[in-house]
Amino acid sequence: MKIENIKTLGELKKSGYESKSIKDELRSNLREKIKSGKPTFEGVHGFENTVIPELERAILSRHNINLLGLRGQAKTRLARKMIELLDEYIPFVSGSEINDDPLQPISRFAKDIIEIKGDETPISWLHRSDRFFEKLATPDVTVADLIGDVDPIKAANLKLSYADDRVIHFGMIPRANRCIFVINELPDLQARIQVALFNILQEGDIQIRGFKLRMPLDMQFVFTANPEDYTNRGSIVTPLKDRIGSQILTHYPETIKIARTITEQEAKLDMAQSDMVYVPSLARDLLEQISFEARESEYIDNKSGVSARLSITALENLLSTAERRALKSGEDKTTLRLSDFMGIIPAITGKVELVYEGEQEGAAAVAQHLLGDAIHTFFPAYFPKIEKLEKQDEKTPYTDIIDWFFAESGFELLDDCSDEEYERILGSIVPLEVLIKKYQPQLQKEDKFFMKEFILWGLVEYKKLSKDRFSEGYQFKDIYGSFISKL
């Protein structure tokens, strides 16, 4: 007999069901997962040796948890993943507002119904997906919202005195009894509201409007908070921090590989889009490097963080840029270009908080700086390093390319030009082909033209060529030609 088919308290007792607190439930199921070698927080990448072990220790210790980290560090995702460590179903007294355990009732409603009906008390089953409550801490949250208040309408309808505890309307926290309760952005919660959480965290009981209710709530609290006060927000009051068992610091992905895994998992790409646009591996790496550069940039306030959402939305915009270009050219398939990266600027500008120098430059200019920095960082990994100081007349691997620009006066690369035109223009620069054959002989055919454009952008970043943006595309010239044209 399936346990969730049990419908009365008597049947539940006969089945041998034993009550467990939610913290014991999480602990027990986590122990089984660790023993079996299964991943405990599947789909969360980059925390395997840092955050997840600390989170597992906190759960095994039955602690309430505070996840402390900058924006876009999977804090809420981790909290939501804890649902998977709960039992699939738990019983509760049918009609109970606070999910009363039939074997250990705490509300007056549940105690009264069990006293009247005994083993015939009807019970229902709560699935683990319904045992997750989340509240974003905003300045307008009140004690009544979280804990509860006296309900005058209820008192009038039931003809009850205000001295009767049945007039209480329970808030979110009592209604989340035997559940995981997450409060996001805890510092935004007013200090007086944080004080109201003291008793719940330490003793597990609540007080509503002077009613001395001894309700030992059974809850797993998870808080999320940002460590930096970069807005006009408050802070976590010290006695509340003292009552939170474990504080765990999250972080951004530490490698390009992990960042790529996260972006590819989270980006919402259309199947037709993915089939139409071929994305070279280097393009995906460059996209992730932009976030890494942003976190170190002098133009961006690193205290506010650069969310992993930047790369996710940038990838979506990047493919949409290439898709739009291909549709305008009447092409069924296309390969991503480096010039398509201009389409990701709107995804960057809204997700970085600029310092004074960045504001002076402008958000769009900062976004272009970040792309340039990413190319500058990656270039030496693919081609010989360009030295700042070179001897006069010394031949370098790039001399023939630079000479070609002196001879041909450069070219224009339009944003919406067809693949045929794009390949014709880059194919006309023969020294690019020679350089790739020498230093990237294993390069796939599909990646060749992206790599050619990458070389040109790299030479621009190392001040060997110049690149100017105009309304319809880019103009590449030798460094002196660009200087003369500006006179």
What is each model feature region?
Residues 58-61, 84-88, 203, 293, ...:
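Amphipathic alpha-helical interaction surfaces
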Residues 273-280, 293-370:
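C-terminal helical "lid" subdomain and adjoining coupling/linker elements of P-loop NTPases
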Residues 2-257, 268-285, 298-303, 383-487:
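Conserved ASCE/P-loop NTPase catalytic core
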Residues 263, 287-291:
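Short alpha-helical scaffolding segments that buttress acidic/His motifs in well-ordered protein cores
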Residues 335-423:
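Extended alpha-helical coiled-coil/bundle linker/stalk regions that scaffold oligomerization
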